[in-house]
A protein has these predicted regions:
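Long helical/loop segments within the catalytic core of UDP-sugar-dependent glycosyltransferases
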Residues: 1-58, 101, 108, 112
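Active-site donor/metal-binding and catalytic loop motifs
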Residues: 3, 81-96
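Catalytic donor-sugar/metal-binding loop of nucleotide-sugar-dependent glycosyltransferases
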Residues: 33, 58, 67-86
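Short, hydrophobic alpha-helical packing/hinge segments within bilobed ligand-binding/sensory domains
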Residues: 66-67, 96
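Active-site-adjacent helix/loop segment of glycosyltransferases
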Residues: 97-156
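Membrane-proximal soluble regions of multi-pass membrane proteins
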Residues: 99-118, 196-232
Length: 233
């Protein structure tokens, strides 16, 4: 997905995160000979494979669930970089908001409710592909990952100041530094022509703006699939 012309910094950061999730990470898994998550478009299936699973689930991220179901049946999705489907992020704030809520509440719901069961199935079936897809599912959305590591650093360094516990503080700082390095490398290799590096400096503020979205997940999460408001014309 691409940011429409004249889009603000938040949408540009979202475009970067989208490319990392749907191009960079799947290419990495493919280089390791492992499957990828399904992405909602540009997918091809065999009728016999679809007959193995229940399609009538109505999940917010039904594409991701479909990929996990197929993998558990011994049909792991294979990444095909030549299959490209392009679209634009909604230009309206209402459309953007509903789209983000559906994606992120759906991802988090599936991660919390489904990941333990998938991990157990991967171990009992000795299904390495399913284990890899489950580990990939456990990676939270980029904004939430940034917020989590910032919060972890705050707590860890506070513990260091109060109790002298240095190891947790340095581990938390190293994790945050590794995330920053990974983001910088992803931008340099795959997104340099997409956005200037200066836009990435807005990422912490972009993450902070999504705090209400994550609070709503805890208080009143979205469970029904709602189509995003599209732009007219």
């Amino acid at each position: 997905m691409h940011a429409p012309a004249g889009a603000g910094l938040a949408v540009q950061v979202a475009e970067f995160a989208w490319r990392v999730k749907n191009l960079v990470r799947p290419r990495g898994w493919a280089r390791l000979g492992l499957p990828c998550q399904l992405m909602g478009a540009g997918m091809a299936f065999g009728w016999r494979d679809l007959a193995l699973i229940d399609l009538a689930n109505g999940h917010l991220v039904e594409d991701v669930k479909l990929g996990l179901d197929l993998c558990q049946q011994g049909k792991p999705p294979v990444f095909c970089p030549e299959a490209v489907v392009s679209s634009l992020f909604p230009a309206s704030q209402q459309g953007l908001g509903s789209q983000r809520t559906r994606w992120e509440h759906g991802h988090l719901s599936l991660m919390l409710a489904d990941a333990p069961r998938r991990a157990l199935a991967a171990v009992t079936q000795r299904n390495g592909s399913l284990l890899a897809m489950t580990l990939d599912l456990l990676v939270p959305p980029l904004a939430l990952l940034v917020l989590s590591l910032l919060g972890l650093n705050l707590v860890a360094w506070l513990a260091y100041l109060l109790f002298g516990l240095a190891a947790p503080a340095w581990i938390a700082l190293c994790a945050l530094a590794l995330l920053g390095l990974a983001v910088a490398l992803a931008w340099a290799r795959f997104c340099r022509e997409l956005i200037p590096f200066s836009v990435l400096l807005y990422a912490p503020f972009y993450a902070a703006r999504k705090v209400p979205l994550y609070l709503r997940f805890l208080i009143k999460r979205q469970v029904e699939w709602v189509r995003s408001k599209r732009d007219e014309g």
